[in-house]
């Protein structure tokens, strides 16, 4: 213990904590302890503010479909890096390995199979007891000439692009309601706003997904449940050609990591007033509408 010049004992720990405030030392150790406590609280607040800047979460749980590779895997890695427990699904076994790598889990399954969706949701709740975020990602539907695409292929596209989202949300929405909120991002395509002749099924059904995103967001906004869609342009998980690059005003393909960071923001508290939006991340390939 050391004296402060007025005969008042003050601990070296307090002196170190308050530094230049030594001239305010005083009459009792209680005042010193009070200042020390306030200094610690201020330091904790500064740490919290730094964390918020990086969209760090604590033990939130994100469910991600088609997460075995490409954008889905990049999103899983980004969310895991910002603090989420991840629950992954993909048709291949790659989501299983990635889930284990990221400290979560994965299953092999398809968004077109209701039993697989049930398994993913049920296992997530069994392991973690909650679901805070959903990323509805899928593969690509059949392509073909506009009138040559068969009814079966149109139905397959509907199953893959739109009904998968409906099915997931039927199961997760009651969980969100019980928890008091949740956030969803649907991965779509720029073709929802600018249809591409080589991919009519994707163009038409992703436009339908944009409408459904708005409908869902409006219906559940009052319950603190948000839904947005991200509409990527050409991303580096696709084969890159000079012809495609020439179409993109930004002069390059997008990166899966850029999509992942956009998704992480939309799921964060910082995007708490953003819902019902279809957000293009496309290097300006779609002209203003």
How would you name each of these model-derived features?
Residues 194, 275-289:
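Short C-terminal tail/terminal secondary-structure segment
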Residues 221, 226, 274-276:
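Short, small/polar-rich loop/turn modules that mediate ligand/substrate recognition or access, typified
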Residues 189:
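Residue(s) in the substrate-gating loop at a strand-loop-helix junction
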Residues 145-146, 150-158, 244:
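Substrate-binding pocket helix/loop in short-chain dehydrogenase/reductase
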Residues 68-69:
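Conserved glycine-rich cofactor-binding loop
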Residues 174, 218-219, 272:
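Alpha-helical segment proximal to the catalytic Tyr-Lys
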Residues 169, 205-206, 213:
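Active-site helix of classical SDR
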């Amino acid at each position: 213990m050391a004296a402060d010049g007025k005969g008042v004992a003050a601990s070296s720990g307090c002196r170190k904590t308050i530094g230049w405030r030594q001239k305010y030392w005083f009459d009792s150790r209680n005042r010193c302890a009070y200042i020390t406590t306030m200094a610690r609280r201020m330091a904790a607040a500064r740490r919290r503010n730094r964390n918020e800047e990086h969209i760090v979460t604590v033990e939130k749980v994100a469910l991600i479909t088609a997460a075995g590779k490409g954008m889905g895997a990049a999103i899983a890695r980004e969310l895991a890096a910002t603090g989420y427990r991840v629950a992954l699904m993909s048709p291949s076994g790659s989501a299983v390995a990635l889930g284990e790598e990221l400290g979560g889990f994965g299953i092999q399954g398809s968004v077109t199979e209701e039993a697989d969706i049930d398994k993913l949701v049920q296992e997530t709740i069994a392991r973690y007891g909650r679901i805070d975020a959903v990323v509805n990602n899928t593969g690509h539907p059949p392509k073909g000439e506009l009138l040559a695409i068969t009814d079966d292929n149109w139905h397959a596209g509907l199953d893959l692009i739109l009904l998968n989202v409906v099915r997931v949300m039927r199961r997760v929405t009651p969980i969100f309601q019980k928890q008091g909120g949740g956030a969803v991002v649907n991965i779509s395509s720029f073709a929802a706003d600018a249809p591409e002749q080589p991919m009519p099924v994707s163009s038409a059904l992703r436009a339908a997904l944009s409408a459904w995103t708005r409908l869902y967001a409006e219906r559940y906004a009052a319950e603190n449940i948000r839904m947005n869609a991200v509409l990527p342009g050409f991303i580096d998980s696709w084969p890159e050609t000079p012809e495609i690059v020439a179409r993109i005003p930004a002069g390059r393909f997008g990166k899966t990591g850029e999509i992942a960071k956009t998704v992480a923001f939309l799921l964060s508290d910082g995007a708490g007033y953003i819902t019902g939006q279809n957000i293009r991340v496309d290097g300006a390939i779609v002209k203003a509408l």
